[in-house]
Amino acid sequence: GLEALIETTLGMDNVEASATSSDRREAMQFGVADYAASCRARTTNIGGLNPHYPGDQWHDGLSRMLVACRAYGLRPVDGPFGDFNDPEGFRLAAGRAAALGYEGKWAIHPSQIDLANDVFSPPAAEVEKAKRILAALAEAATKGLGAAQLDGRMIDAASARMAENVVAMDDVIQTKSLA
């Protein structure tokens, strides 16, 4: 399949058109360095944050690309983190992308591969909670209920969809690990 690399302001402005440009398209990747240059962002740290910006200056671009990917069935992949001597910086950048719903991140150095696998793999506790959510909702459904309570919180169909995503990702990872 085809993958698109979104790395300019014009590319981001046309991200939806890019997402729908071919039936062979499978994924989109965020090219943060060229995107930063295109935005004239004041940074020289590829994929890192500028300490003078209050938050994550890449959030808007990452979010826009994620929405286009998910709306049209593509896999979103975050771009590089240039300082391969900063594993914590890589982990933080990857964590922000994973929290948004990205499925992976470029590793430009062998030291980043295990970090990426760790960040984008749901922790065992998260998988277990997701399974508990699905079980509680299945039990509620047998009683004709569309919602339930788990650990003092309301869960419903949206909770089930989020939990299914976690379990599905874990299933893929576990299957690949066994291969």
Residue ranges and their predicted role:
Residues 1-179:
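Expand to "…catalyze enediolate/carbanion chemistry for C-C bond making/breaking, isomerization
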